[in-house]
Amino acid sequence: MNDTVLILIRHGETLWNTQLRMQGSLDSDLTPEGESQIKALGEWMKEVPFDYLYCSDTTRAHKTAEAIRKFTGHNLNLDKRLREKNLGIFEGLTSEEARERYPETFQQFKTAGASYVIDQGESTQQLLERSLDAIEEIMDLHPHKVTVVVTHGGVVRVLMKYVLGIPLDSPTQFLISNTGIFRLVWREKWIVAEMGGVPHLEKVNNYSV
C-alpha cells in the first residue's frame, strides 16, 4: 500500500518579500525573479508523480500553483485555511515601520508568544489550528496518495514545528526559501523526507541559498 505523502511548497518571490514587508493576508505581485522561480518549479513538478494539488487562495500562492498545474494538468483546489498568518495592523509594513508606528504593540508581538493575537489579526496558535484543520481534512480525503499544497512561509513553519515536536514559542527557525519544497511521509507519524529543497532553482539566474 502506498504511503500518504504531503508536499508543502512556499509561493514564489513577491515584491514585498524583497522589501521585507509583512504580507500576511494581503498580496503583492510576484517579482520577475518570482516568475522565473514558479516557471522552474512547474517544469520540475512535471517529473514528480503526485495525485492532488491544493493552494492558498492568495494571489501569490494561486499563481505559483497555476504554474504547476500548467505543466501537470492537475485540478487546482483553493482553500483559504492555507493563507498566511493574518498580521493585522502590521500588514504592509516593514518591521522598522511597525516598531515606529506601534511601539508597544510591536514589542508585545515580538515577546508575548504563540497565543498573542495581533490587533485585527490572529495568533500563531490560531494559524496552526486552521492550517492543521486543512491538512488533516486533505489527508482524510486522499489517504495513500501524494498531495501537493502551495502555501506560505508562516504556514510551513508552524506545520514543521508541529511535525518535529518543536514548541511554537521556540525561536527555532527553518530556511523556507521561495518555492522551497518540504516533503512529509505518514508512517504512523509524520516523517520529514525533504526539508526546504530547491533543486528546480539551479538553472534560475542569480539564485543562491
Task: Walk through the language-model features, giving the residues of each.
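Active-site-proximal alpha-helix that buttresses catalytic centers in soluble enzyme cores
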Residues: 13-74, 78, 122
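Active-site signature of alpha/beta-hydrolase-fold catalytic machinery across serine-
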Residues: 67, 158-162
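Acidic, low-complexity terminal tails and accessory targeting/binding regions
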Residues: 1-5, 88-99, 140-145, 161-209
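Short active-site segment of divalent metal-dependent hydrolases/proteases
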Residues: 14, 155-156
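Short beta-strand scaffold positions
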Residues: 55-56, 129, 150-151
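Phosphate-handling substructures
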Residues: 29, 70-130, 185, 191-195, ...
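Short, conserved phosphate/pyrophosphate- and ester-handling motifs at nucleotide-, phospho-/glycolipid
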Residues: 11, 152
